[in-house]
């Protein structure tokens, strides 16, 4: 249990649910992330390298009025590598922010894995944002690229002229 000082300087225990408990826990919390950590390695690449596991489903795509589709770790890895190469050719570098303006689907998983494996930062943006909200977030984040699909292309194109730092 977390401790906090009382008014009489006698240590008191902050009980779960008490006002100071969350604050004490928050102050004491530290992330324990290894100095060299890549989310794409953990979520995709290590599985894709194993011949047997690479053929196993990584993503199950379910959509109304469509047949369910299964995608393997191998497919995810292959497509993510292709997209990473395209992003690199566009000048995206480690630490750059890449906006991902797509609905939840297999291609969105590919986009995140591609961005993460190259050390860039994937920034999710809702496909429901209007032009002002989208433009503000692209500017404020200093995103260098916005990835979109057919459903969000018009919205991204409508603000692209005002985002000169994008590739």
Feature map (PLM): residue ranges:
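Short aromatic/basic micro-patch
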Residues: 38, 70, 147
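Structural core segment of the AMP-binding/adenylate-forming
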Residues: 2, 89, 110-113, 117-167
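Short, contiguous pre-domain boundary segments
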Residues: 21-29
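Conserved AMP-binding/adenylate-forming core of the ANL superfamily
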Residues: 55-113, 130-135
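Active-site diphosphate/adenylate-binding microenvironment
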Residues: 30-38, 104
């Amino acid at each position: 249990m977390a401790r906090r000082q009382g008014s009489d300087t006698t240590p008191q225990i902050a009980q779960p649910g008490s006002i100071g408990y969350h604050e004490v826990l928050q102050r004491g919390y530290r992330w324990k992330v290894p100095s060299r950590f890549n989310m794409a390695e953990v979520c995709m690449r290590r599985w894709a390298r194993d011949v047997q596991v690479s053929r196993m489903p990584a993503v199950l795509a379910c959509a109304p009025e469509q047949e369910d589709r299964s995608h393997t770790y191998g497919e995810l890895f292959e497509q993510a590598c292709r997209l990473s190469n395209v992003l690199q050719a566009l000048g995206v570098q480690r630490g750059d922010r890449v906006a991902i303006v797509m609905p939840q689907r297999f291609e969105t998983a590919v986009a995140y894995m591609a961005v993460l494996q190259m050390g860039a930062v994937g920034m999710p943006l809702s496909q429901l944002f209007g032009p002002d909200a989208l433009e503000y977030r692209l500017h404020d984040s200093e995103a260098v690229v916005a990835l979109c699909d057919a459903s969000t292309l018009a919205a991204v194109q409508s603000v692209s002229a005002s985002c000169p730092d994008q590739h």
